[in-house]
Amino acid sequence: IYWMFTKIFYKYSSSIAVVADNGQKLTYAELGEMVAAKAATFTPYVLQFCLCENNLESLVFYLACLDAKAPVVMLDAKKDAELLDHLRNIYRPGETICHEDLAVCLTTSGSTGSPKLVRLTLDNLRSNALSIAEYLHIDEHERAITMLPMYYSYGLSIINSHLIKGATLLLTDKTYA
């Protein structure tokens, strides 16, 4: 991926990148191939919606958007259909041309209780991932469980900070009380 993961896919090519809920394991090389194939279906700078679940499909979609320079709005796959239609009408995914620096939009309720989008650049994502990885001493021996949704900033930062260091992600939507 042009902004930070390409060399990681090669450097850790034989290491396990992802373990899915169903037990499926992917190496960094395999994940990189899936991401490249999906990225080829996107147009640079054209907005995409990712209806997120903590699964392989959503992870590949997110990474492919970054690879293709296609800004992505990360949304809860279980969002109310009426709200999703409203967001589609406003933002027109697949049609809207975005600024070249825009990488990801995350929803926040803000102070009004209605969804707002926070815009993040590639530099924002990279510096956040590297800062977290450095502070927590994350390396290729770490394994992170995706307990938080990837459409949350904290959930996404866990993904980015672990992938950038060649660690393993354990993808799950399960919650434990």
Residue ranges and their predicted role:
Residues 1-16, 97-103:
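A short N-terminal helical cap/helix-turn-helix that marks the beginning
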Residues 5-7, 56-74, 133-134, 153-165:
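Hydrophobic alpha-helical segments in the ANL/AMP-binding
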Residues 11-43, 81-88, 96-97, 120-123:
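Conserved AMP-binding/adenylate-forming core of the ANL superfamily
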Residues 27, 103-130:
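Conserved AMP-binding A3 loop
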Residues 34, 52-53, 73-87, 167-177:
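ATP-dependent adenylate-forming carboxylate-activation enzymes
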Residues 39-78, 147:
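Conserved AMP-binding/adenylate-forming
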Residues 65, 108-111, 144, 150:
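Conserved S/T- and glycine-rich ATP-binding loop of Class I adenylate-forming
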Residues 126-143, 153-177:
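Conserved AMP-binding/adenylation subdomain of ANL enzymes
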